[in-house]
Amino acid sequence: MSPQTETKASVGFKAGVKEYKLTYYTPDYETKDTDILAAFRVTPQPGVPPEEAG
Protein backbone atom coordinates (compact mmCIF):
# COMPACT_ATOMS: atom_id res chain seq x y z
CA MET A 1 0.00 0.00 0.00
CA SER A 2 1.40 3.43 -0.95
CA PRO A 3 1.71 6.21 1.64
CA GLN A 4 -0.95 8.90 1.61
CA THR A 5 -0.03 12.48 0.79
CA GLU A 6 -1.83 15.61 1.85
CA THR A 7 -2.88 18.10 -0.81
CA LYS A 8 -3.69 21.66 0.14
CA ALA A 9 -6.05 23.45 -2.26
CA SER A 10 -4.91 26.89 -1.15
CA VAL A 11 -1.34 26.32 -2.33
CA GLY A 12 -0.69 27.70 -5.83
CA PHE A 13 -3.96 29.47 -6.60
CA LYS A 14 -7.39 30.29 -5.26
CA ALA A 15 -10.43 29.14 -7.16
CA GLY A 16 -12.98 31.68 -8.27
CA VAL A 17 -13.44 34.57 -10.63
CA LYS A 18 -11.75 37.89 -10.00
CA GLU A 19 -13.34 41.12 -11.14
CA TYR A 20 -11.69 42.03 -14.45
CA LYS A 21 -10.80 45.60 -13.55
CA LEU A 22 -8.78 44.31 -10.58
CA THR A 23 -6.42 42.36 -12.86
CA TYR A 24 -5.82 44.39 -16.02
CA TYR A 25 -3.92 47.41 -14.65
CA THR A 26 -0.37 47.24 -13.32
CA PRO A 27 0.63 50.70 -12.01
CA ASP A 28 4.30 49.80 -11.44
CA TYR A 29 4.86 48.40 -14.96
CA GLU A 30 7.97 49.76 -16.67
CA THR A 31 7.94 49.96 -20.46
CA LYS A 32 10.56 48.17 -22.54
CA ASP A 33 12.06 49.02 -25.93
CA THR A 34 10.26 45.99 -27.39
CA ASP A 35 6.76 47.01 -26.20
CA ILE A 36 4.21 47.76 -28.91
CA LEU A 37 1.37 50.23 -28.45
CA ALA A 38 -1.90 49.29 -30.14
CA ALA A 39 -5.28 51.00 -29.98
CA PHE A 40 -8.69 49.50 -30.75
CA ARG A 41 -12.12 51.04 -30.72
CA VAL A 42 -14.57 48.80 -28.86
CA THR A 43 -18.32 49.34 -28.60
CA PRO A 44 -19.83 47.35 -25.71
CA GLN A 45 -23.07 45.47 -26.10
CA PRO A 46 -26.02 46.77 -24.07
CA GLY A 47 -25.57 45.96 -20.39
CA VAL A 48 -21.78 45.47 -20.58
CA PRO A 49 -19.59 48.00 -18.72
CA PRO A 50 -17.22 49.78 -21.16
CA GLU A 51 -14.08 48.74 -19.23
CA GLU A 52 -15.03 45.07 -19.57
CA ALA A 53 -15.95 45.19 -23.27
CA GLY A 54 -12.36 45.07 -24.47
Curated annotation (Swiss-Prot):
| Compartments reported by the entry | Plastid, Chloroplast
Task: Return the InterPro entries for the record.
Answer: RuBisCO, RuBisCO_lsu_fd_N, RuBisCO_lsu_N_sf
Give the transmembrane region(s).
none
Cellular component terms, GO, for this chain's entry?
chloroplast
Q: Which UniProt keywords apply?
A: Acetylation, Calvin cycle, Carbon dioxide fixation, Chloroplast, Lyase, Methylation, Monooxygenase, Oxidoreductase, Photorespiration, Photosynthesis, Plastid
In terms of Pfam families, this protein maps to: RuBisCO_large_N
Q: Which residues carry this modification: N6,N6,N6-trimethyllysine?
A: K14
Question: Principal localization?
Answer: plastid
Major enzyme class = lyase
Which reactions is this enzyme annotated as catalysing?
2 (2R)-3-phosphoglycerate + 2 H(+) = D-ribulose 1,5-bisphosphate + CO2 + H2O; D-ribulose 1,5-bisphosphate + O2 = 2-phosphoglycolate + (2R)-3-phosphoglycerate + 2 H(+)
What are the protein's GO molecular function terms? Answer: monooxygenase activity; ribulose-bisphosphate carboxylase activity
Q: What is its EC number?
A: 4.1.1.39
Q: Which domain of life is it from?
A: Eukaryota
User: GO terms for biological process?
Assistant: photorespiration; reductive pentose-phosphate cycle
Q: Which residues form the propeptide?
A: 1-2
* Residue numbers bearing the N-acetylproline modification: P3
Family, as annotated? Belongs to the RuBisCO large chain family. Type I subfamily.
Q: What does this protein do?
A: RuBisCO catalyzes two reactions: the carboxylation of D-ribulose 1,5-bisphosphate, the primary event in carbon dioxide fixation, as well as the oxidative fragmentation of the pentose substrate in the photorespiration process. Both reactions occur simultaneously and in competition at the same active site.
Q: What else is known?
A: The basic functional RuBisCO is composed of a large chain homodimer in a 'head-to-tail' conformation. In form I RuBisCO this homodimer is arranged in a barrel-like tetramer with the small subunits forming a tetrameric 'cap' on each end of the 'barrel'.
* Quaternary context: Heterohexadecamer of 8 large chains and 8 small chains.
Annotated protein name in UniProt? Ribulose bisphosphate carboxylase large chain
State the organism named in the record: Geum borisii
